[in-house]
C-alpha cells in the first residue's frame, strides 16, 4: 500500500510506480507469423512415412555442450528464472514457467525438455534417411525453436503427435507453437501431412 500511495502524495503519475512486465524466456529462432506462413507454404505435403526401424537411440540426445553441462541442462538454465546450478550443472533452485499449460514449477524433476517436433515424427517425415550426425544435431538443436522446458506430464501426453492430433492446453499458445513447429520442419526440410498442414493453418490464424 505504501508503495502505491507515495507516488500519489508526491504528485507522480501512478503508472511510474508499475514495473514493466518481465519477458518470459523463449526458445530462439521463432519466426514472425508472416514468415511462418511463407515457410509453411514451401513445405512438401506427403503421406507420413513408416515408423519401422525407429529408436530414440538413433537420435543421440542430451550431449555435452561444454564443461559439465549437457543439452538438457543448458535448456533448463535458458528457460528458467533465477536458476542456481551445482558443480555438475544440475539446477538446484529456480523456477520454470511452462507455456503449454501455464504452470510454474520449482523442481527440475517436474519439467521435461520437449522436442517441439518429436523425434519419431521427424523420423516419419524424412529423418529416417539422415546420418547419425544429422539426427544428433536435430535432437540437440539450440539454434532453432526445437527444445523447450515444459510440464512433464503435458509433454508425455503429447508423445510423438503432430498438431493435427495434439495442441498445447493453452489456446493462447497455439500461434507460437505453430510458428515453432513450422520453422523446425522448414529448417530440416521435413515433410508434413495434409491434416498437419490444415491444423497449422488454423493455429496460425490465431496469431
Language-model segments: which ranges?
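Domain-level detector of nuclease and nuclease-like folds
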Residues: 96-207
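Aromatic-lined ligand-binding clefts that engage carbohydrates, nucleic acids, or primary amines
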Residues: 29-102
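An acidic, glycine-rich, mixed-charge low-complexity segment common to nucleic-acid enzymes
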Residues: 22-30
Amino acid at each position: 500500500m505504501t508503495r502505491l500511495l507515495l507516488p500519489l502524495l508526491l504528485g507522480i503519475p501512478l503508472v511510474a510506480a508499475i514495473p514493466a512486465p518481465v519477458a518470459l524466456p523463449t526458445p530462439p529462432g521463432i519466426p514472425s507469423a508472416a514468415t511462418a506462413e511463407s515457410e509453411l507454404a514451401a513445405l512438401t505435403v506427403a503421406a507420413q512415412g513408416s515408423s519401422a526401424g525407429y529408436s530414440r537411440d538413433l537420435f543421440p540426445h542430451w550431449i555435452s555442450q561444454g564443461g559439465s553441462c549437457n543439452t538438457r541442462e543448458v535448456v533448463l538454465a535458458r528457460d528458467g528464472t533465477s536458476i542456481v546450478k551445482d558443480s555438475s550443472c544440475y539446477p538446484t533452485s529456480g523456477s520454470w514457467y511452462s507455456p503449454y499449460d501455464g504452470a510454474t514449477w520449482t523442481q527440475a524433476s517436474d519439467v521435461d525438455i520437449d522436442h517441439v517436433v518429436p523425434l519419431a515424427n521427424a523420423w516419419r517425415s524424412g529423418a529416417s534417411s539422415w546420418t547419425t550426425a544429422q539426427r544428433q544435431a536435430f535432437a540437440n538443436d539450440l539454434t532453432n525453436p526445437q527444445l523447450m522446458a515444459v510440464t512433464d506430464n503435458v509433454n508425455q501426453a503429447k508423445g510423438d503427435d503432430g498438431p493435427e492430433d495434439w495442441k498445447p492446453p493453452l489456446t493462447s499458445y497455439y500461434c507460437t507453437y505453430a510458428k515453432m513447429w513450422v520453422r523446425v520442419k522448414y529448417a530440416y526440410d521435413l515433410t508434413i501431412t495434409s491434416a498437419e498442414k490444415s491444423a497449422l493453418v488454423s493455429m496460425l490464424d490465431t496469431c
